[in-house]
UniProtKB/Swiss-Prot annotation:
Ligand binding (NAD(+)): 11-16, 37, 101-103, 125-128
Alphabetized CDD domains for the sequence: DHDPR_N
Family: Belongs to the DapB family.
Record protein name field: 4-hydroxy-tetrahydrodipicolinate reductase
NCBIfam families noted in UniProt: dapB (TIGR00036)
Binding site for (S)-2,3,4,5-tetrahydrodipicolinate: 159, 168-169
Chief subcellular location: cytoplasm
Species for this entry: Cereibacter sphaeroides (strain KD131 / KCTC 12085) (Rhodobacter sphaeroides)
Active site residues of this protein: 158, 162
Function as written in the Swiss-Prot or TrEMBL entry: Catalyzes the conversion of 4-hydroxy-tetrahydrodipicolinate (HTPA) to tetrahydrodipicolinate.
């Protein structure tokens, strides 16, 4: 067992953090060697297994990420932008693969990730599931095949606690559509219409976000023309798909050179 890659999970007390830890523990392909929480969390100092309501697993939750990363081969991180860029710098110091599922990253955050990627492997994706990444590739292909007579809209739905919109996955799909069209998403993007908006701008890519209940994640890419419509759809019903994808990325990154990668690289798409 000791020759299996050691994994640290950040944001251990959150829903994704707990799912990630359970996935690593059940995988048989990696070891959970660390769990990180913010200072002041009531999880700090507790056994991670016991904190999740199960048996002790011999991993104590810590608020010292560098010490945890130093004993790991990979860090899996679904937290918040400011925390993620700090973790990226520390993971680079430890030369640990950093798998990032955090969304809502701004250009300034991405600049710091680019620096960290000079020293360590970073795998970052708005969505870690196989199905969504296949949807992304299909979206680009369909956008390549259809002209501007086909309007493109991305509609996403998530649980009421999600704090950013559009979702990272929706933006990933929008980027794929923009690549297919050969345009810059920043110029084509229209988010959340309200009031008197006037006619739809030709070539624009629209985004709409729904928040409610416990929706895990739903994404539709709509290609609409006069008299016909194509809808590409992915529905997530279990967060385990993201955890399994993140673990796959952490294992894949073990043999790679420092740099930035995404799930398309991991899946060979």
């Amino acid at each position: 067992m000791s020759d299996l890659p050691g994994i640290v999970v950040t944001g251990a007390s959150g829903r994704m953090g707990q799912m990630l830890m359970k996935t690593v523990l059940a995988s048989g392909r990696a070891r959970l060697v660390g769990a990180v929480e913010r200072p002041g969390s009531d999880w700090v100092g507790r056994d991670a297994g016991a904190a999740m309501g199960g048996a002790a697993i011999g991993v104590t939750v810590t608020d010292d990420p560098l010490a945890a990363f130093a004993q790991a081969q990979a860090v899996i991180d679904f937290t918040a932008p400011e925390a993620t860029v700090q973790f990226a710098e520390l993971a680079a110091q430890a030369r640990a693969v950093h798998v990032i599922g955090t969304t809502g990253l701004e250009p300034a955050h991405l600049e710091r990730l680019a620096w960290a990627a000079h020293h360590a492997v970073i795998v970052r994706a708005g969505n870690m599931s196989l199905g969504v990444n296949l949807l992304t590739r299909l979206t680009q292909k369909v956008a390549e095949a259809l002209d501007e007579d086909w309007d493109i809209e991305v509609v996403e739905a998530h649980h009421r606690m999600k704090v950013d919109a559009p979702s990272g996955t929706a933006l990933m799909l929008g980027e794929a559509a923009a690549r297919g069209r050969g345009v810059d998403l920043a110029q084509a993007r229209v988010s959340g219409r309200d009031g008197i908006t006037g006619p739809r701008a030709p070539g624009s890519i629209g985004f709409s976000a729904i928040r409610g209940g416990d929706i895990v994640g739903e994404h539709d890419v709509i290609f609409a023309a006069a008299g016909e419509r194509i809808t590409l759809r992915h529905v997530a019903t279990d967060r385990a798909i993201f955890a399994r994808g993140a673990l796959k990325a952490a294992l894949w990154g073990q043999d790679r050179r420092p740099g930035q990668y995404d799930m398309m690289d991991v899946l060979g798409l």
